[in-house]
């Protein structure tokens, strides 16, 4: 069994895969509670960590002491059919790298790869499997919260309120109260960035790319895209974990 672990900015996610790539079980916890996590037993472990050394140290304290294979990944120049076009390949976030590998494995075609969590990453894969660049912006909740913190008359919207406001996923762009206007602004900033990347990649590749979306706000972004681009968008759960499975099993 292979245990895949994705230490993100706010939460740590994990998934247990069997040899044929079936996800048998998965879970998550806040990084602040990582030492209480009950991880499943596995013979191999592969980890992506973008949460820093403190979280790595805490995670290591609960990993099995017995001699099993534990691999902390770094982005490579080329792996699993994906070429890394970053200026310094090792500086690409390991979560982005794993998600790109999973996306290429799924489509093997031009893709916009979106991971929507505390931050939103929007990355471009061309028709040959080369990562040609991407962008990072604040997550939807983070945009709303920070706007309230630095303005005099706008409310500070907590994560709880933000999630509640988004329960139906669709947000009217013509908002008629301040809280909804802030919510709409954050959502459509993220969606607009996704749509711009999709348009730019279509021009670059001379064909229509797919959009693969993962992360806690994946549904919120997908449901608020506009126009024909919606036909190319799909949600893929656990994209980073699936990429980690591929790296462990198919990378040289």
Language-model features, listed with the residues they occupy:
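Divalent metal-binding pocket/active-site signature
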Residues: 114
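Short beta-strand-to-turn element immediately C-terminal to the catalytic PLP-Schiff-base lysine
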Residues: 17, 123-126
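Nucleotide/phosphate-binding catalytic cleft detector across ATP-hydrolyzing
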Residues: 1-11, 15, 23-111, 128-252
């Amino acid at each position: 069994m292979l245990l895949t672990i994705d230490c993100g900015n706010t939460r740590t996610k994990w998934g247990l895969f069997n040899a044929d790539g079936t996800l048998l079980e998965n879970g998550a916890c806040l990084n602040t509670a990582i030492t209480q996590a009950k991880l499943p037993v596995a013979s191999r472990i592969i980890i992506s960590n973008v949460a820093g050394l403190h979280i790595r140290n805490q995670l290591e304290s609960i990993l099995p002491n017995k001699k099993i294979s534990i691999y902390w990944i770094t982005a490579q120049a080329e792996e699993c059919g994906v070429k890394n076009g970053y200026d310094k390949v090792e500086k690409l976030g390991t979560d982005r790298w794993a998600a790109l590998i999973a996306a290429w494995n799924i489509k093997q075609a031009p893709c916009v790869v979106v991971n929507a969590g505390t931050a939103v990453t929007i990355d471009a894969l061309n028709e040959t499997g080369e990562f040609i660049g991407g962008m990072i912006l604040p997550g939807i909740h983070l945009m709303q919260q920070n706007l309230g913190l630095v303005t005099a008359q706008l409310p500070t919207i907590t994560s709880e309120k933000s999630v509640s406001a988004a329960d139906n996923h669709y947000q009217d762009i013509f908002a008629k109260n301040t809280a909804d206007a802030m919510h709409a602004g954050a959502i459509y900033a993220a969606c607009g960035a996704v749509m711009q990347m999709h348009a730019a990649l279509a021009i670059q590749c001379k064909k229509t790319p797919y959009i693969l979306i993962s992360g806690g706000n994946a549904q919120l972004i997908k449901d608020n895209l506009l126009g024909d681009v919606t036909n190319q968008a799909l949600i893929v759960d656990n994209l980073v974990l699936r990429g980690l499975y591929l790296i462990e099993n198919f990378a040289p």
